[in-house]
Amino acid sequence: MHIRDILKFNKDKYFGGAVQANWFYDADKVSAIADSYVFHGPKYHGVNQQEWQNTSYKLNDTATYALKLAKRASETESNRFCMTIAGYGTGKSHLSVALASLLSGHDEELRQLVLKNISVADRHIREEIGTYLHKNLVIVLNGMRDFNLNSQVLAT
């Protein structure tokens, strides 16, 4: 028996090469990038939370993280800061384009693509996210480039 007999790769979700966060602004790329991101829900999160109980941060699966961001974007009086930390090549830029497409609301078709992908990971999280969505000003910055934050914000 071979691995290929047990597992199948979803070629519809394959995106070749590294994703750049600023591709959120590229109309030719953003749809393919946002649609190809594969969210995982709490049932498929490969982290044992007991191992991380003594840390100051909580690890989240990507569907739960999307919900957390949608909730925070709806709040008006709290600190809405969230940080994503992960190693090189783990999909942070890909995730950022998908989340920006979801939260900005500038393109409803794009938002629905992302919601569909979240639904595959966890239908209940997708339904809850829907109650928090509205249009947001989303500014995506590529931290790998040397940039002046003030000029980047003014350019948007």
Tell where the protein language model's regions lie, with residue ranges.
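Charged/polar, solvent-exposed surface patches and flexible loops
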Residues: 5, 64, 68-71, 127, ...
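Extended, charged/polar low-complexity intrinsically disordered regions
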Residues: 1-52
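Phosphate-binding glycine-rich loops and adjacent basic patches that engage nucleotide phosphates
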Residues: 7-20, 57-63, 111-124
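P-loop NTPase motor core
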Residues: 53, 57, 82-87, 94-156
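Short coil/loop residues immediately preceding or within conserved phosphate-binding loops
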Residues: 79
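Context-gated lysine
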Residues: 8-13, 29, 43, 58, ...
